[in-house]
From Swiss-Prot:
Catalytic activity, as annotated: L-threonylcarbamoyladenylate + adenosine(37) in tRNA = N(6)-L-threonylcarbamoyladenosine(37) in tRNA + AMP + H(+)
Binding residue positions for Fe cation: 111, 115, 301
Leading EC class: transferase
Its job: Required for the formation of a threonylcarbamoyl group on adenosine at position 37 (t(6)A37) in tRNAs that read codons beginning with adenine. Is involved in the transfer of the threonylcarbamoyl moiety of threonylcarbamoyl-AMP (TC-AMP) to the N6 group of A37, together with TsaE and TsaB. TsaD likely plays a direct catalytic role in this reaction.
Superkingdom classification of source: Bacteria
Protein keywords: Acyltransferase, Cytoplasm, Iron, Metal-binding, Transferase, tRNA processing
InterPro entries in alphabetical order: ATPase_NBD, Gcp-like_dom, KAE1/TsaD, TsaD
Location(s) in or outside the cell: Cytoplasm
Annotated protein name in UniProt: tRNA N6-adenosine threonylcarbamoyltransferase
Organism: Wolbachia pipientis wMel
Length: 335
């Protein structure tokens, strides 16, 4: 059995986990930075300072709760990209320091791969499988062929889906993060009232574009007095629009996989936006594949997914040198 201590500091969550190859989570400590909610978005400098302030305490707490010592660990893993460079440096340097002192292997984890693979901690999802990664910083389709081996089928040409949710929420006067509030208000709204543009729909390929939807919402806000019901109807119409786009793109992704002679049975939808229950249900109803969603706490950023990905990479003997530099931009294809 292998056991890993993992660190996640790529954005505004400071998290530490201890995970083993028997699929047991021995400890998980996470601190979300409330400061960014007051400011309407993540401030990179504030985020990195908070990581420096809290990370060592979370590591100490996780080790104590696991009833292990550093000598009991088989490796130390950290999210080393992509993400905000300040946070990546804090987490990666701390993990490398522990690895050096404890004389344990260091594993640099790609944040995107961690989102893609965490489902295998919970379910018997076998390679190859289709991945839709929808989060605050990323929106892309991938075929996961194996650990460290991916084919990107498409991605956003402008904003990520999470950014679109947050920016639309801000236009409507809602607080950050906007996704949960849009989902809540949409339940009271009429999703057919406003016809928002479905960019890229009915076109070949798997790319996305969400800038036109934002512009359409901005125009609605300027035209209407935006009563409480108007806000609810915009939220509902926005979610309907997004679900139509995702369904269209998924169909194309399946076709692209077939054209590559890759048989896909399992479809994993992950990332922060995958916690949206409306989108989950729409995709479940219309996609004829085995669909898997991580639980909500594993859709958003966490260290459990980093630890499990560390386990998967350790089992392949994918070890990284202690001079590995964090990468704010890191394509999963080149992993």
């Amino acid at each position: 059995m292998k056991t890993i201590l993992a660190v996640e500091t790529s954005c505004d969550e400071t998290a530490v986990a201890i995970v083993n190859s028997d699929k047991q989570v021995l400890a998980h400590e996470i601190l979300s930075q409330a400061e960014h909610k007051k400011r309407g978005g993540v401030i990179p400098e504030i985020a990195s300072r908070a990581h420096m302030e809290h990370l060592s305490g979370l590591i100490k707490s996780a080790v104590e709760k696991s009833n292990l010592n550093f000598c009991d660990l088989n490796a130390i893993a950290a999210t080393s990209g992509p993400g905000l460079i300040g946070g990546l440096i804090v987490g990666t340097m701390m993990a490398k320091a522990i690895a050096h002192v404890a004389q344990k292997p260091f594993i640099a984890v790609n944040h995107l791969e961690a989102h893609a693979l965490v489902i295998r901690l919970l379910h018997e999802v076998k390679f190859p499988f289709l991945v839709l990664l929808i989060s605050g910083g990323h929106c892309q389709f991938l075929i996961a062929q194996d650990v460290g081996k991916y084919i990107k089928l498409g991605e956003t040409l402008d904003d990520s889906l999470g950014e679109a949710f947050d920016k639309v929420a801000k236009m409507l006067g809602l607080s950050y993060p906007g996704g949960p509030l849009i989902e809540k208000l949409a339940k009271k709204g009429n999703g057919t009232r406003f016809k928002l543009p479905r960019a890229m729909i009915k076109r070949s390929g798997c790319n996305f574009s969400f800038s036109g939807i934002k512009t359409a919402v901005k125009n609605l806000v300027q035209e209407l007095k935006m009563s409480e019901q108007d806000v609810c109807d915009v939220c509902a119409s926005f979610q309907e629009c997004i679900s139509d786009i995702l369904l269209d793109r998924v169909s194309n992704a399946i076709i692209m996989a077939e054209s590559l002679n890759i048989k896909i049975n399992d479809f994993v939808i992950t990332g922060g936006v995958a916690a949206n229950n409306f989108l989950r249900e729409k995709l479940k109803q219309h996609i004829n594949l085995n669909i898997f969603f991580p639980p909500n706490d594993l859709c958003t950023d966490n260290a459990i997914m980093v630890g499990w990905t560390g386990i998967e990479r350790l089992q392949k003997n994918y070890i990284d040198p202690l001079n590995f530099a964090p990468r704010p931009k890191w394509e999963l294809e080149s992993y």
